[in-house]
């Protein structure tokens, strides 16, 4: 029986969360075309007769001096210190850039075993030649490279085999039926945030967060009251929408997803609140990103 921890690293929107959800077979990490949707270290657990893999999905690696981004980068570095293996995922639709150089530098300095995953091989018009040349120049051995499609589950079985090859004998860290260790409040707040991101302009998702005010199980149904906080007054109108159209859409789609995941009826009530410049408050950022 083998077991261990594997961190998923990569630039924003490379398919890290999709890979986590695909292999674990459940919606664990929220997904959006908006870069850096993932803020926290999200654990996904895969168990079979060979052992157990605990994946840690990390925020997208992005070089920026904004407080929020710096906090997320600290998250990535702390994740690396917790694992036996790093899965570095590259979107083959994009040319290698400054982030690729920095990520490989961090990985090599860590002395931790790693695999490079070339994701989205099911798509056309890729930069596979440029990426292959880049990895060759960085002296990455072919044995450490796997071509995959996280969405289409291409070569994910080969990936699991490779991961187990890099793990040592060990116990199961979680019961077999577990697929994540996230608390229900966090999962629900992330689902609401995901649905808000799907509706809104690109710049707005970075200025909102969700807090669960009330979460109760009443006669077999979830009763949830949640607050969506924004950083300035104008953003409230964007989220609420004309005659409440946007917030109603966010709430309805979040309710459907919550009911499906937790296999129960769900009553969800959302309210939009202003917390001016919250994304510049160190204490709040630290609480939200962990």
From Swiss-Prot:
Residues that hold GTP according to the record: 10-17, 57-61, 119-122
Chief place of localization: cytoplasm
Membrane topology of this protein: Peripheral membrane protein
UniProt signal peptide: none
Region (G4): 119-122
Parts of the chain that traverse the membrane: none
GO cellular component: cytosol; plasma membrane
Chain residue ranges for the region called G5: 148-150
Matching InterPro entries: G_ERA_dom (IPR030388), GTP-bd (IPR006073), GTPase_Era-like (IPR005662), KH_dom-like_a/b (IPR015946), KH_dom_type_2 (IPR004044), KH_sf_prok-type (IPR009019), P-loop_NTPase (IPR027417), Small_GTP-bd (IPR005225)
Domain Era-type G: 2-169
Region G1: start-end pairs: 10-17
GO terms (BP aspect): ribosomal small subunit assembly
Localization per Swiss-Prot or TrEMBL: Cytoplasm; Cell inner membrane
G2: annotated segments: 36-40
Quaternary assembly: Monomer.
Function, as annotated: An essential GTPase that binds both GDP and GTP, with rapid nucleotide exchange. Plays a role in 16S rRNA processing and 30S ribosomal subunit biogenesis and possibly also in cell cycle regulation and energy metabolism.
Family stated for the protein in its record: Belongs to the TRAFAC class TrmE-Era-EngA-EngB-Septin-like GTPase superfamily. Era GTPase family.
Protein name, as recorded: GTPase Era
């Amino acid at each position: 029986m083998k077991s261990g921890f594997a961190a998923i690293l990569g630039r924003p929107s490379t398919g890290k969360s999709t890979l986590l959800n695909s292999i674990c077979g459940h919606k664990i990490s929220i997904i959006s075309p908006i870069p850096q949707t993932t803020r926290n270290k999200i654990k996904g657990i895969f168990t079979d007769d060979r052992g157990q893999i605990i994946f840690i999905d990390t925020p997208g690696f992005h070089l920026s001096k904004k407080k929020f981004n710096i906090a997320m980068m600290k998250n990535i570095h702390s994740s690396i210190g917790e694992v036996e293996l790093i899965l570095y995922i590259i979107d083959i639709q994009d040319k290698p850039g400054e982030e690729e150089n920095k990520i490989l530098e961090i990985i090599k300095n860590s002395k931790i075993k790693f695999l490079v995953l070339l994701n989205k091989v099911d798509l056309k018009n890729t930069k596979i030649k440029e990426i292959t040349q880049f990895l060759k120049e960085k002296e990455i051995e072919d044995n450490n490279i796997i071509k995959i499609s996280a969405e289409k589950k291409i070569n994910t079985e080969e990936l699991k085999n490779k991961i187990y090859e890099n793990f040592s004998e060990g116990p199961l860290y979680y019961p077999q039926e577990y697929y994540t260790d996230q608390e229900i409040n966090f999962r629900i707040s992330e689902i609401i945030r995901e649905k808000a991101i799907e509706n809104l302009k690109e710049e707005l998702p970075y200025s909102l967060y969700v807090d669960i005010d009330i979460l109760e199980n009443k006669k077999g149904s979830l009763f949830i009251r949640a607050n969506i906080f924004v950083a300035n007054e104008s953003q409230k109108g964007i989220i609420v929408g004309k005659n409440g159209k946007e917030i109603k859409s966010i709430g309805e789609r979040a309710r459907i997803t919550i009911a499906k995941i937790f296999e129960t009826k769900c009553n969800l009530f959302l309210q939009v609140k202003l917390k001016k410049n919250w994304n510049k408050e160190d204490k709040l950022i630290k609480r939200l990103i962990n």
